[in-house]
Amino acid sequence: MGTLVWTDDYTEPFDFRVQTYQGHPVLTFWSGELLDGYGHGSYYILNQSYVEIAHFSPVGFENLGDIHEFTITSDNTALVPIYHAVTADLTSVGGANDGWIFDCTFQEIDIETGKMLFQWNASDHVGVNETYNDVKNVGTENAPFDYFHINAISKDANGDYLVSARVMDAVYKISGKDGKIIWRLNGKQSDFDVEDAAKFAFQHDARWVDNSKQTRMTIFDNGPTDTIGYSRGLLLAVDQDKMTVRLLQDFANAAKTFAQFEGSLQPIDASNESTNYMLGFGSQQFFAELDKDGNILLDVQFSKSNTVNSYRAYKLPWQGKPLTKPDIHYDMNATTAYFSWNGATDVEKWIVYTANATNSSTWTNVTSARRTGFETTIDLSDIKLNTYVRGKAVNSAGGVLGWTKAGDGIKLFDAPDDVQENSLSSSSASSSSSSSSSMRSTSTAAPTSSSATAAAPSSSATGAAARNIAWSGWREQVYVAAVVVVGGLAAA
């Protein structure tokens, strides 16, 4: 399936991915309290060393930022949504005239200064009667009616916004000048002639593929529609002159999975019309990679059913350079050493050293092994060892990345990194990998159900949980996905 690269204990992370901020790759995500189909929290940016370089909330809504979107624009601004209760007349949908709705607001914020540059409220522009949601027993102050459900926001090259509203079955183009709706695509009041094959329902992750020309759009169609009973990714041709929409290609996995909520479709290289596509199934434990014609290249189930969900799935390059030291657990009784380095992506090999004193200026190289996963296990049973054992992480060119502390089988001790090295043997030890969630006590904590997690593809899949159809040329890539346990069904 894949091996862990990095994990941390941020609470209930959502929309976890690699983006660009101020010209550098960064990790971004939301963290906070996950509620019934929305959330209250804030937004984080980490640099390549996993250091938090920005943390903010929507302006005027401290710690009330929603889970569904955190996009950084080319202007180093952030697009973020807010769900907040306001009064509304619900008689058009069978509710009270003094009812309550979740107003879906989004803001564009200058990340560096914290200044709000733009704000848009759904209730100012979209009527309650456009919704496909049922008011049922909600519509009160304690249980507002979720009539719009914003779940994707992006900004095009002209300064206008593309907004997805799940329970409207519609995508909106919003003027960046005055907030007026330029057009509606799909839904009850569509301004487009949408061919039947291109119609969608309860969608997520609407994006322009070509942000300048705005002729192709991707959408994750949760469904079901009148003709399709499973979830799929859609590549649509959008003609804003003729006001027509047609299907260029749809994308589905082999199981024809239905994801009730969440999901994503990512063109891996949006500048290339022949690019592959990454398809994530949100509330279901599947992701897939497909070629431009919808042929499945990779089809994976990464967990048991109804245990975890990954809001969106991405395939993105990432180079992690942690400031922490690598970790070692040395089991003296089993004469086994375990090596890991949370977040490091460039480790090619672990070299094992031994000495009789932690402050020794000379350490003896006794063996080495290629990194085989998040945690690499090295058998030292046939090697004569001194009192202390430690490891050195090196990259593919042999460059030193970092040294672990020294262990005596009981405790870990500080030891100098600037040392002389003696060589005992040129042989390499046998090793095995472990990405288990039960990490050794001296290692950085493994992923939990509420961790932000980056995972890298491995060269093999495990058991029936993964269906590896074509796994070639992936060694340089890193998957980035947020894995979050949901205690119950929520329309996220």
For each feature predicted by the language model, list its residue ranges.
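Ser/Thr-centric signal marking residues that sit
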Residues: T372, T376, T404, T444, ...
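Cleavable C-terminal sorting propeptides in eukaryotic secreted/cell-surface proteins
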Residues: S458-A492
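Fungal extracellular serine/threonine-rich, low-complexity, intrinsically disordered "mucin-like" regions
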Residues: F413-A461
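Extended, compositionally biased low-complexity polar/Lys-Gly-rich tracts
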Residues: Y44-N47, Y277-G280, M439-T442, A446, ...
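Histidine-/acidic-rich catalytic cores in large beta-rich domains
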Residues: M1-L424
